[in-house]
Amino acid sequence: MKVDIFESSGASRVHSIPFYLQRISAGFPSPAQGYEKQELNLHEYCVRHPSATYFLRVSGSSMEDGRIHDGDVLVVDRSLTASHGSIVVACIHNEFTVKRLLLRPRPCLMPMNKDFPVYYIDPDNESVEIWGVVTHSLIEHPVCLR
């Protein structure tokens, strides 16, 4: 998997943008609901530990069923401890990959696409390093301009 790594930049270029507290309907809208506005700073929302956070751009389709697609940007926090079920960035034989970490019944890195094999972790003869826990994914949706 090819990855592009971006470090978390300082807050000097970060701007707060309007954030409406009312949840938006994905069904039929209610015109009677009012909308309360606050400010949302995406850097503060996505980056809990700036010195331990980096961004990766996904390349490949092994995590599509986990809603992580080719081209998405992942927010990865190295200060968090991965646990059973965490989405992690791992380094295997000097190659980076993003997978779901399963610790039981047998430790493995599980792709979220049935077309890809499970990578079983054998602690006796193999070095797998967890580089961080994925906390957010940023998806760019196509925009149709007229």
Swiss-Prot record:
Assigned keywords, A-Z: Autocatalytic cleavage, DNA damage, DNA repair, Hydrolase, Plasmid, Protease, Serine protease, SOS mutagenesis, SOS response
EC numbers for this chain: 3.4.21.-
Family annotation (InterPro entries): LexA-like, LexA/Signal_pep-like_sf, LexA_repressor, Peptidase_S24_LexA, Peptidase_S24_S26A/B/C
Site (Cleavage): 26-27
Role of this protein: Involved in UV protection and mutation.
Protein name (Swiss-Prot/TrEMBL): Protein MucA
Family: Belongs to the peptidase S24 family.
Originating species: Salmonella typhimurium
Entries under PANTHER family matching the protein: LEXA REPRESSOR (PTHR33516), LEXA REPRESSOR-RELATED (PTHR33516:SF2)
Domain of life (superkingdom): Bacteria
GO MF annotations, alphabetized: DNA binding; serine-type peptidase activity
More info: The mucAB operon is the plasmid-borne analog of the E.coli umuDC operon.
One GO biological process term: proteolysis
Phylogenetic lineage: Bacteria, Pseudomonadati, Pseudomonadota, Gammaproteobacteria, Enterobacterales
TM spans (from-to): none
Principal EC category: hydrolase
Pfam families: Peptidase_S24
Protein's gene: mucA
Active site: 62, 99
